[in-house]
Amino acid sequence: MRVLVIAGLLLLMESAAARATTQIHYVMGTFLRVTVDDPADPGVFAGCFARARALDRTFSRFDPMSELVRLNAAGGGLASPLLRTTLAQAMALRRQTAGTFDVSAGAVTALWREAAVPTAADVAAARATVGVVGLDGERIVLGPGTTLDFDGFAKGVAVDACVDALRAAGVTRALVSFGESSLYGMGAPRGARAWELDVRGPDPEVIVARLRLRDRGAAVSAAFGGDGRRARAQHAHIVDPRSGRPLSIDAASVVVAPSAAEAEGFAKAVLVRGDGGVAAAEERRGILAARVGRDRVELGTAMRATGTLRVLARVRRVEGEVALR
């Protein structure tokens, strides 16, 4: 069974096995697709989607009644175990990525979602709020002006929760995709060794590589086009927490990790860090990373050695990387 990833878009191909069952629900402002390749009662999907909706009620930044919106508005306070645990996981990833992934950069991200390009003073003020967050028992402590934005990371958390629900229901072969950029492959489709996904780069007509997933999470993060000023249209979801400015690059990252949430964090970090981002990510145990540019694909040492991401014949290798023909 193969799947297609198009600049962060995940689609089942026509070659997907007919015996697999797929359900798609709209959650967290995007689509959660679950494909099960086990003989299973349709009820196995219910637990998965229920967990995703519960997470949406916690992490949505659009629902004024979500726990996250209310916490940000209050400047911190008592928080549910789910929110505290997820924040602790995100804070650990912030340390592991040297601050290139940071859910406390909500003020900076929100600034670049506005229609007008912010002033340098606005950016500096928002940047000063990043990282001013802590856990104190059952409370989340936020500095003045600091807001949390879990965004894609929450989708990774939802994928992992969905996988847990499927396992509890006895499912061993499934592919979970959320927002068409965060995913997890459970086992492998019958008759195959892994879930296979085709990855396209900035040119939607060119399939760059093939990703193989088996009992691993993955994330695809992309920032193609733009000049770094029109963040609202093209870069608002990828802002460098250190500088407070959106990325102005033409690249995508592919990261494989033990969980989808970890993959989400490191996928953003690879892009934000730029040169050396792939190698830095792979310093962490269990992380495989790659970076796709307009003219080359950089494979991390571990990604290359395991064959998890295989560059297709239509591209050629150049000095440890891969140059597109």
Label each PLM-derived region with a short phrase.
Residues R2-R325:
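Mature catalytic core of soluble alpha/beta enzymes
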